[in-house]
Amino acid sequence: MLWTEETMRQVTGRSSKNSTIKASIRLASGGRFFSASMVENVAEEGDIVVTIDTPRATLVTAQILSELSAETILAINGQNLLSSEVAVVSDAIDNKLAVIALDKKAHDLLVEKFSERLHFTSPLLSTTHSDKNAFIIETADSSTYYLRLYNNGLQLAEALDLASEDELLYYVANILDIAATDIPIYINSEEKKVIRLLKKYYKVICE
């Protein structure tokens, strides 16, 4: 979700440097699983951008982050940090930053290995199709969803943990109501069941 300083309501998205290494880490079970094996195989030079796949994330503007701590932002978003978690913040893209709940052990391992080379990001910050009016649905697994609505700019972004098909259809229908116009729906998912479900009710473009 994107929080705007004007409304403080949940609404809701970095340019890569040269020699930047990008890695994607899926933190299953709500962000509490981390495999350290990949860390030892990463090159010793260049920035490290780690994408954290977890629904325990939200978007804010730089202004909001200057007024509230990352921990407070997650708490207000209904994502109180567990004792085993820390809050991390991404670099900014178009004045938007991701605030993410991350397992402490994973965080400490990454910081110890990469220190100032380390940058975090979230799929919520993806800019795919940001140049058009579109609704984008991405999945990390069968229950972790990233929903982004572009309607004359980023209007809404959600990182969600959905337990059922009905929940997914509820959110999709509500976001399309927010759009209040016909827009293309793009889906990026390896979950064939999800694709079949959405195709049953909507015209979707698979990527």
Label the predicted regions.
Residues 1-207:
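Hydrophobic/aromatic-enriched cytosolic interaction surfaces used to assemble or bind macromolecules
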